[in-house]
Amino acid sequence: MSMKYKTGMFGGSFDPLHTGHIHDIIRAAAMCRELYVVISWCRGRESTSKEMRYRWILNSTRHLSNVMIRMVEDQALTKEEYDTPGYWEQGARDIKAVIGKPIDAVFCGTDYLGTGRFEALYGPESQVIYFDRSEVPVCSTDIRAWALGHWDYIPSVCRDYYARHVLVLGSESTGKSTLVRNLALAYNTNYVSEAGRDTC
């Protein structure tokens, strides 16, 4: 299959990764011989570690042989500090350096459409392609605020990070098994039976 672009870039903090990101990565990968997914990170601003986000993206895109993941660090401790022209300009320089070759296509969401930001940072050598975020209407901010309320948008590879685990300990014949079953029913989840019940 002939790809429209030789080298593409899709960047973000992916903090956390959600199905909208995966949707856009798959679309971008279908258009490029090589797609670089660039994770922006800064120690102190992260809600999930850069290593965790790297693993999530790697495990979600492992089947896409043309997807490469890179990381770029910045020093902005807040989102407001990061969202300034100086940080974006430095970020673009860092991204170009880590990719190390001309970038034909830059992919981003329609929330940036009309700002001219990506065109100024990557043009004219890069075409900026906007993906409509309304196709998968979620953002990382929503998930950070209430993960369980946006559970359907959290990829399966990320869900264990958000799942709550409860361990019930106690002497035998005190009602642990019944309690665990009732909790699982009440919270619409699963449970693991006591090992001793089946093996002893």
Describe each PLM feature range.
Residues 168:
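Hydrophobic anchor at the beta1->P-loop junction of P-loop NTPases
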Residues 172:
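The conserved Walker
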Residues 2-165:
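Nucleotidyltransferase catalytic core that binds NTPs
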Residues 179, 183:
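Hydrophobic positions on the alpha1 helix immediately C-terminal to the Walker A/P-loop
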Residues 176:
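Conserved lysine of the Walker
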Residues 185-200:
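Conserved substrate/cofactor phosphate-moiety recognition/catalytic segment
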